[in-house]
């Protein structure tokens, strides 16, 4: 069921739809996506059906299908109708006179699965002024979520991180990556005393407050 109230930033939309952030901005700038603004001067945001459109468009083979601006509008409109259906009756949807057949049910399931993982990532992270001065940490620990994501980005093996941070579970590593992609850290990352040492669980005496 379509959530008319829920909106997403371009970074959130990129994670859920599985496309680069620059693609999200291009589809906004060139159409057919029409962003909402929560308030004057705020960042532009997208609706759930827009994420579905991005995921569908990503799956089109550009060697076979080149959509014009009008074609993108028609595809977006068809996707909204399908998305609003409580129980979509068709697995595949014919478009443009039957010349294009899309497996929208599969894409819908993938988008909702990614959205669920994003929600789990959000729920996993806590920002408490009493814990490292409000640094986003993995719930139940004093481990910064951006630190874990950075380790993975720079090639650290999951086994190495799990050995050094025994309180973490493997799923939390994947969720940390998702969170960092959806909510990029602003500004220059802070320096921490354990950056020059192998990955390990930090003690309270080492923790920045």
Per-segment meaning from a language model:
Residues 23, 52, 144-147:
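Pre-recognition alpha-helix immediately N-terminal to the DNA-recognition helix
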Residues 7, 21, 30-36, 43:
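Helix-turn-helix-like N-terminal two-helix hairpins of bacterial/phage DNA-binding regulators
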